[in-house]
A protein has these predicted regions:
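Short, surface-exposed, charge-dense and proline/glycine-enriched linear segments
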Residues: 78-80
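Glutamate identity and glutamate-enriched acidic tracts
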Residues: 2, 20, 39, 58, ...
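Beta-strand-rich recognition/accessory modules
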Residues: 13-15, 47-49, 82-140
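Acidic (Asp/Glu-rich), glycine- and aromatic
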Residues: 30-76
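Extended, loop-rich substrate-binding clefts of extracytoplasmic carbohydrate-active enzymes
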Residues: 1-42
Length: 140
């Protein structure tokens, strides 16, 4: 597919692996994201794409299995889901995706580099293969 003002592809090369992330604007409220492993790493290691979201701490997460989770100091991760929602958006995803909270950054302003939960991110990890995996992000 040729890039356009509504569709583009990002190619990422790391550790000898080549991956593509393709983005397409569906409408004013929806974005399609797909990932594909173009070339595996020479040493056979797994490839994973990570999508990072800045959370709204006051908004709980709702999952396709009917459960919910708060964005607190308590860590959790979920797999086997087909979607989850947070604040004013919803993400459909393949069941192989993993959703993690909290993923803490390195904080260069603390002596030991630790970060507080207020700095945490919500991360969706997609195991990559030659078969494309697709997500759909919808903002209401």
């Amino acid at each position: 597919d040729e890039p356009s003002d509504r569709r583009w592809t990002q190619t990422i090369t790391t550790a000898g692996a080549v991956a593509e992330l393709a983005f397409a604007i569906i409408d004013d409220h929806s974005l399609s994201i797909s990932s594909r492993l173009v070339k595996p790493a020479p040493d056979g290691r797994d490839a994973t794409a990570h999508l990072t979201f800045i959370p709204y701490p006051e908004s709980p997460i709702s999952f396709s299995d009917g459960s919910t989770a708060e964005l607190s100091d308590d860590a959790w991760d979920k797999t086997g889901l087909t979607s989850f929602g947070h604040h004013n958006w919803n993400l459909t995803l393949p069941e192989s995706a993993r959703i993690n909270w909290p993923v803490l950054p390195h904080n260069p302003y603390t002596d030991d580099g630790h970060a507080a939960t207020e700095e945490a991110r919500l991360v969706v990890s997609l195991p990559m293969s030659e078969t494309p995996l697709s997500l759909k992000l919808t903002v209401q």
